[in-house]
């Protein structure tokens, strides 16, 4: 009996070390992307890594589901900046679910190709965004969060990175009390970026 418990404890320790190793690797890749110049970026990997980095924000309030297009082409972009967009979106989704206060919610992360673009969606079952403020959410310093919890920079930064640095689009669909979906589209290659 003692031998079985020791084996089980060893297995759990190995699994714990593996999880810590994954978190450290994700944080290293997140904070020190390979390049600070435009280059090929795997958005599926960016989204998965960002979810690992901010797991403490969502693990007690929501389940996270990935519906990733495994054949999604890389985009030409700034990996570090796209990491920041993904992180902000997932953290905001977690906060919206937590603010709803109705138990475990859900965050869904999707990717797919649309012609010469890639589309990513981050949906949550949180509070939703009231219609009267939706047109202001990308303004710098605009926040509905309590002092100390939000600066109003996350969505403004995401908008700048997606629209100005990557010539993409960012849109929001939201229903109060039901949740929100942010939809980001990015051109796949540099030629599309220049034409945009």
Which positions does each model-derived feature cover?
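Core catalytic ATP-binding domain of two-component histidine kinases
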Residues: 1-196
